[in-house]
UniProtKB/Swiss-Prot annotation:
InterPro entries given in the database record: Ribosomal_Su5_D2-typ_SF, Ribosomal_uS9, Ribosomal_uS9_bac/plastid, Ribosomal_uS9_CS, Ribsml_uS5_D2-typ_fold_subgr
Pfam assignment, any one: Ribosomal_S9
Keyword Hydrolase: no
Cleaved signal peptide residues: none
Official protein name in the record: Small ribosomal subunit protein uS9
BP GO terms, sorted: translation
GO CC annotations, alphabetized: cytosolic small ribosomal subunit
Family recorded in the similarity comment: Belongs to the universal ribosomal protein uS9 family.
GO molecular function: RNA binding; structural constituent of ribosome
Gene symbol of the encoding locus: rpsI
Keywords: Ribonucleoprotein, Ribosomal protein
Length: 130
């Protein structure tokens, strides 16, 4: 394998991403596809690039990413978390800046379970007076 490769695992909702950073030109490959092909939505692409733009390293690393589970938003968040962890493995002094932007903390919000007697987690059946 590469002599200087940095790894980070990211999670968000039900998605988990494995991120490998290698010194390069800024190429991003997600599940054998480019960032533009994998994420059609511009917002998801922006979320993925946030940690790199913050520390001015967009063109410094090539990224190989595998991501599983969840939807578009969850996967983008998981990748962002993974990139953040990999950047901290590369240079621990970036932690403060990334922490201030809120990228280091794992977003613990998960889907609330459906309750018996309710239509959804909190949505009650319609009330009828008569």
């Amino acid at each position: 394998m590469a002599e200087n490769q940095y790894y980070g695992t990211g999670r968000r909702k039900s998605s988990s991403a494995r991120v490998f950073l290698k010194p390069g030109s800024g190429k991003i490959v997600i599940n054998q596809r480019s960032l533009e092909v994998y994420f059609g939505r511009e917002t998801a692409r922006m979320v993925v690039n946030q940690p790199l733009e913050l520390v001015d390293m967009v063109t410094k690393f090539d990224m190989y990413i595998t991501v599983k589970g969840g939807g578009i938003s969850g996967q983008a968040g998981a990748i962002r978390h993974g990139i953040t962890r990999a950047l901290m493995e590369y240079d621990e002094s970036l932690r403060g800046e990334l922490r201030k932007a809120g990228f280091v903390t794992r977003d613990a919000r998960e889907v609330e379970r459906k309750k018996v007697g309710l239509r959804k987690a909190r949505r009650r059946p319609q009330f009828s007076k008569r």
